[in-house]
């Protein structure tokens, strides 16, 4: 029934209970199989476990839970006897309670009548009440695969009046649309309705919600999840929040099944997946990337011809809108010796890392170009790195590509984390989450540095980054991913990182997965060209002969497997005859009496064929023939009553050869002391295979190689007939594991000690005295045997030595309590072992888990512990990981908002320090209808934004319960759920920091912060690391401008942030912190044809392009000011005159300082007049009947006069004029009968017609905008008096007062004060406050205004959505107009919608609004090493070229030619350098409302918005693509190769390549410079 939902080729997870296992059945416990790129290990037991019984710990959430049992025999009219369709019954039976199933008739209703999905006529269903959970089941007599029976859950709602009237016979009505399509039933169909009284048992485990083309941060995910609680959803249901955030339900899981519909409760985990994410592919370029597989395909070609096309196809099928970044990660080995000389776990000593950025944030629409670029770069990378130019110009080979096992894996992971270290970086409002995919030619085994491993794991605990490893090789026969490292004592360890998921790419038919393929690759041997015939001649191994006791081959195989893998548990004194009888079946010897007997084993002869002689040894513990490849973990038998708390330590499990006791003919236990041995330090890491392969080449024949292997094999065998095998046979000549060895301890330390066992029936006391009174058995949990047959233990505690700074002291302690669980804690509470180990376990399990023997398969329980701790909630329980593989690649998940991991109580009490602070809401916020609940929500919201997760689960409940003595029940909240009888309590955690937030009805919010104490600074233990980087358009590698290893997420001052959220932002101490920020510029573009003419008051006005764009900017500012955040009182009151008055933007042409010097008086008076004289006394108000002479006097000489100034526009100067918009504002302020701008325009046109004033060019009527008007000569006041008055007013202006009033723009009056008006502006304008405090000697001129606006004027959001806007007061139409946004807890999608509205408004007036980086361009490479840029040195240096060198010109403008080149190429001025603003001979300081400008270089923006350019002091140009805008403007869906890209897409690469070719072409550049020279000679005019 899932065929329609998931496509034809996707295999659904059955919704019907099945007794078959969820994973592939394997032959035995040690088997490993590869299925769809996933390594499946372990037994054939069903992975599904029995569901937890919640019992008495149900939360007091206000919803009463009823537990009962259904009785499906009471279906009306006979019904369907199999109604539950295999559903598990979880309810307890309540006698006498029967749940009826009602047959009903289906009807449909339209959305215009009701938005409810399902409605019932509750009169006909007496036991169903509004709000109950109800199940709807369809019925088909002959259900098919495409149209089977479906179950839909919904919340009961009664028919409304209109539905009752329209539905004559139907008693169930469903909303037409999605649900109707899913059910696929005609009207009046028969369905079944049944009450589900126990919501808690039926709630879904996981619900997956896909979003696209929007940024949904984790705070909003928490808010939206809370809105979905106590609702029902169905597959492919489209949901909308705030009428803006839209998503689709793509997965509903319960009890390991994917179901069609489900109920969402508080325990349901809602996972948000992104269809528009930022994907980063890091491709490891190692020596193996040029290797060929057995199929003849090169690994790199396998990646570009198989993996990438398949994943692009997946993206196209899902219709994703991702942006992708692809980089090569290379580690070059520059040492003189081969890496084979290094021991396992040892890193390269002399290496250099390179990162080549192939593409950066490119839309997947350009996938064809991406693949071509990828192939070209791979062809060039070898030549670029292996060839080194000598001083004489020769090219010599230098270094070699490192093997993948010795590559820079952790370094590249840290390189990827650099883009996420700042949680308040400028956001991409169209993409959610960042997903890293590392493509490796290896098989998941890496040698890493111990200190760097600790640092990397620590760093990733605080970042919201998902990471997948895709291996191009076949899956190995060991646990993956696997890291080898050497600790500070040079001991070798194997570990599995908990922050990395691994997949093996195999594009062949899935049937081939069932075929056996060799996993050991000896590439040099394979490439020697030896044919099969030559191989047969060199290595001649004859066939084996089976024991004649075996009657059939199948019987022999079954018995062998049973004996090998179903190891019996031998208790002391047990009868071992049965074991002896079974084992003797397979004991054989050589015919020539060469006896191989490592233990006392009864031998029986076998017949042989020909002269072949071989041995079958009974695999009592699957002991390898050549060496001890996998060491079974052993533990004492817990049935023994007295055991000391200190178990045997690490040296015994790692280096001792302890085998399962077997019985000899005398039924005696023998544990040969000679099994303990000590290896020399020089030989401790020698591997047989590695030793044999060293130096293997065509000069060393295969025959020699084979002889060496056989010699190694039999070197320790004593060929004497009657001699037993001596202790040298199992001397530790080889590694203890297939991948390496631990450094052994002295034999005196290797003895098992400290174990006092009391057991009767043990044999030989001599053996006991040597080994201790001990019975040992295998750790059978790793083979998946039932837990009741072995010790019940937590698999997560299967850990190795400590990885903290106290590693050497605590490593043994970790192993001693390796399998102690919560249930056994009471047995060992007498010692400190448990608490210390639990602390250690938690610390280690956050980042990695040590593995004793990587080749031993792990149990399913232990495999679950290998999931990333912070990401565990993403995966549904009981569902195989392979079902989520492609979802991780196509729709990566964001970090879940919840985490179930929490420190133990002992760890929490002992190892955390306590800090606390309290927060109360500022009373000023009450006028905006804010309460302490809103503050509490914002505090939690902000923590989720910075990576915190809400703690849930039993452990955090236990911690909270231990705090509340005397209370029988404790609730730790997940969502905002206030209970009158209880305080709100919520825990959040990130890395080693835990916050406990509590709030009661008093309104005081307490924050308790717990910080892990005595943590070593891991960043001090790792040296600096500067790799070489080559971005997309660079021609050579250079040093990176960032140290990827030492970049981390800084801790935040949460006390300060909480005070800011509460409304106390004026008292900030740390001025470096800021909220979220975005910068936009408005650029001129093509004007729509129908915009040139405008009809104003019935009169047609024709405007030129410049006037249209200026008018567009005024409309934009008007839209911003009308969005001012209002108090509740203002919202209820009438619209006032104040709202009709707009702040003026002063437009100018020519140099900025000329305009400021000319208009300084106007700039000062405009700020003062707008603030202080916004209203005059009612007695002085005029009306429309005023005489023109009196009106002229009031305008020019009244108290609230208009300043007449000389204005220059381009090259024309206009004497003593005013601007139309300025007159409109004056009329509204001073006339009692003019309340709107429209009224003011009509009156202005009237007095203009009467001759009061005229347009300076006699071109326009009176208009509201930037149009110049002059008074008619008869109405002009005395000039001398006017100038004297103006001068007097200028001297009265107080610079400090002007700073304070102008810095907040139009929001400085009380009506504009908002919750963040004193917060965000105060944060950003910190330098202004500092300057004010230092009593500046010069007046400060503010060139921008700020205003706090309401982003949600319709009130759709449940929280206040506000944002601070900074916009220019002074603007040149030939430059960029700037708008900056700052916010804290505002929903980003609402910001995006607001910007979209502004952008559409601009487009109507020939303007384009684009987003650019907030910081200046030169700082980007120091925070984002992936960002591409190019530095261009001009082909002509005009400062030195005789043709263009002009001292007079350069004295006025040193960069005249450079600026002309940029303008001629379509670049517009963005930011001026701070040096330019500070070094001029002026009488004031330049400031902005967002802070003091700190730009090092002048910056330009290309008119397309695609590129940003900087002009350096040396005359070079520094350019970088504006990725944040390019990814926004380009459509994201994939287009086929035969189709061209959309015409609306922006080809940013073409822009930069054309400009670069112009700058490097002498003739093109000379032509442009000649035009610039001619303009200078003609006009002698130099602009900014």
Swiss-Prot record:
One of its GO terms (molecular function) is GTPase activator activity. SMART domains: DEP. One of its GO terms (cellular component) is fungal-type vacuole membrane. Residues 74-84 have a biased composition (Low complexity). It is a peripheral membrane protein. Residues 1-11 have a biased composition (Basic residues). The keyword DNA-binding does not apply. Residues 1198-1273 form the DEP domain. Its main location: membrane. Belongs to the IML1 family. Component of the SEA complex composed of at least IML1/SEA1, RTC1/SEA2, MTC5/SEA3, NPR2, NPR3, SEA4, SEC13 and SEH1. This is Vacuolar membrane-associated protein IML1. It comes from Saccharomyces cerevisiae (strain ATCC 204508 / S288c) (Baker's yeast).
